[in-house]
Structures are given as structure tokens and as C-alpha cells.
């Protein structure tokens, strides 16, 4: 499906930008990518990996047929050709068909999802929503060799330090026996499995949900949901709060008050004139909130809480965070 490929590419880019050092974009034309020198680079990298403790069998198997992938560099250098409006994005990412499937998938996997939800304090509808948006409920995890993709990006050089570390992390995961090198597939950017974790995220946050001694984000749903829930819990999820809600603003609303960095008690927003979409009062809750206005300030407007900011640790896109919350609410029947 063409749009899913577009969304996957965008998601992969978001994974990089969320976890990698900033890389300045310029109008200068980048030099044409060449594979010349890759073999020498790989020999040097393998020596470095061995010196850092990666076993010889892992290095031999992981790099048995490694070649640079020009398509990865093409994706990495590409810029979006068009910009979706918020409404277009939400319709494509949270269509009724995905809501229906989300409800069915949650029901089908309820025992596994709810076990992770209970242990880590992240409600099951959110775990299901992340799963649905990231990988289409596990169907679209990416078909690139993670080792080859990361080696290509590290060799290309623009963010060599970051991708060298991620490649080393990927080898560490293989060396620990979590996944065979040939089965470590993911996005062109190196995001892996049904949770789309980068190798560093895997090492820091992934969990063995089925207690079998290894972490399989590709095939073991217990591990997938435990890992996603642990990540969200660790970076700040509050179990007793929702993510946010759509609201209406007074006509004289000061746009200087808009933005994720401006947080006020809900009661203060009520005094300013912020209301529910039906004109009713805001909920009486002792919570801080921010106002986010999409479509470059044209609306609609959302009141967002702590968990919205937590979602944005996963992906820095405001649209993505609203989509996750919207899908989660729909799955739960809100």
C-alpha cells in the first residue's frame, strides 16, 4: 500500500530525529553516494567491534553478506514532497477500519496486553494504538536487514557516530542471543520489530514479557507489549491521566498561550474561556495542561496533558501524538 510505505518512511525518519543528534539541513547538494571503500570500512569496524567484546561468530554471521544499500541513503536524504493537513493525516492514520481492527485486536490479545498494562501502568488501549499506528498491528515491521541498513548509514558518514553506535548495539543484541542476525529485520533506518525500537532503545527499555530468557520484538507479543509499556512508563506515563482532548477556544484567545511548553492548571484555562467542544465546562481535575493548535495555528485545538508529552518521547510529531490518543480513545469507546 503506497501510503503505508510513505508513513513507514516518515516514521523511520522520526525515530532517527527523536534519538539522534541534530543534523543541519542545507540547500547544498549532497555528494552522490558511492560504495567505494565500504569493504575497508567494514574490516575496520569489525576490528573495533571485536575489541569491544562482540564475539567472532556473531561478527562472521552478522556480516556474512553485508553490502551497502543505496535505497537506504535515498530514503535518508529524501524530503516529503507534500504536506498533509491534520485532517488528511488523521483520516489516513486513524480511519474507521483501523479503529475497528484495533478493537478486535485488543479483544483478541487482551490477556497479553492487559498483563503489560497492569505491570507498567499504561492502559491497554494505548498499547494497542501504538501497535496499530507503528506497524499495522504487527504486519508491517520492515523488510530491511538492520545490520546492513545501519552499516550503510554509518558508512555514508553524515551521522556516522550515531549509526556506528546503533550498529554496535544491534550486534550486542545478536550476541546476547535475543535474535538471529538473519532474522533481525526492520525499517530502512534500523527500527526493529513490532515496537519499532532502535537498537539503543531495545537495550535500554525492552523487556522479556514471557520469561523465556530472551527478548523477541518480532514474534513474541508478550515482549512487544511489555517493552512498549516499560518505555512509556519509564519516560513519564501517568496511569491515572488521559492524553488530552479536543476543545474550543474563545474568539479573543491569545495565541501566545499556545504551545506544549506553556502549562497551566485546567482551572486557569477555564477562566480564560477554553471550553469543551459542546460549550460545556472543562473537567474539574487537578492537572496541568497545554493548548496545541494544529494546521499551523488554524485549528482544531487540543488541550493536552502529561501523557501527550510522554507520547512525544516516542515520536516528536504532534500529529502522531494526537493520532495515538485519538485511536486509543476510540478503541476504548470514549
Predicted feature residues:
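Short, functionally critical alpha-helical segments immediately adjacent to catalytic or ligand/cofactor-binding
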Residues: 49, 58-70, 123-138, 170-175, ...
Amino acid at each position: 500500500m503506497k501510503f503505508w510505505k510513505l508513513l513507514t518512511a516518515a516514521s523511520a525518519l522520526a525515530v532517527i530525529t527523536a534519538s539522534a543528534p541534530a543534523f543541519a539541513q542545507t540547500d547544498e547538494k549532497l555528494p552522490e553516494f558511492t560504495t567505494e571503500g565500504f569493504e575497508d570500512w567494514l574490516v575496520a569496524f569489525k576490528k573495533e567491534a571485536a575489541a569491544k567484546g562482540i564475539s567472532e561468530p556473531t561478527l562472521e554471521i552478522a556480516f556474512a553478506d553485508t553490502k551497502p544499500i543505496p535505497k537506504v541513503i535515498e530514503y535518508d536524504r529524501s524530503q516529503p514532497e507534500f504536506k498533509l493537513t491534520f485532517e488528511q493525516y488523521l483520516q489516513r492514520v486513524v480511519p474507521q477500519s483501523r479503529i475497528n481492527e484495533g478493537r478486535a485486536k485488543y479483544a483478541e490479545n487482551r490477556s497479553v496486553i492487559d498483563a503489560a498494562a497492569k505491570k507498567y501502568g499504561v492502559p491497554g488501549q494505548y498499547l494497542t494504538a501504538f501497535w496499530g499506528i507503528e506497524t499495522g498491528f504487527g504486519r508491517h515491521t520492515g523488510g530491511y536487514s538492520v545490520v546492513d541498513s545501519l552499516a550503510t548509514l554509518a558508512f555514508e558518514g553524515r551521522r556516522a557516530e550515531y549509526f556506528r553506535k546503533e550498529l554496535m548495539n544491534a550486534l550486542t543484541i545478536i550476541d546476547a542471543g535475543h535474535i538471529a542476525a538473519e532474522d533481525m529485520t526492520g525499517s530502512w533506518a534500523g527500527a526493529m520489530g513490532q515496537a519499532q525500537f532502535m537498537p539503543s532503545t531495545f537495550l535500554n527499555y525492552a523487556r522479556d514479557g514471557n520469561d523465556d530468557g530472551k527478548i523477541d520484538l518480532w514474534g513474541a507479543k508478550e515482549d512487544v507489549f511489555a517493552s512498549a509499556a516499560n518505555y512509556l512508563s519509564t519516560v513519564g506515563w501517568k496511569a491515572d491521566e488521559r492524553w488530552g482532548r479536543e476543545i474550543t477556544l474563545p474568539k479573543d484567545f491569545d495565541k501566545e498561550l499556545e504551545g506544549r511548553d506553556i502549562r497551566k492548571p485546567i482551572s486557569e484555562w477555564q477562566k480564560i474561556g477554553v471550553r469543551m467542544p459542546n460549550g460545556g465546562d472543562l473537567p474539574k481535575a487537578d492537572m496541568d495542561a497545554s493548548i496545541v493548535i494544529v494546521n499551523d495555528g488554524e485549528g482544531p485545538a487540543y488541550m493536552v496533558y502529561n501523557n501527550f508529552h510522554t507520547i512525544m518521547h516516542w515520536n516528536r510529531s504532534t500529529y502522531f501524538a494526537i493520532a495515538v490518543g485519538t485511536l486509543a480513545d476510540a478503541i476504548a469507546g470514549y
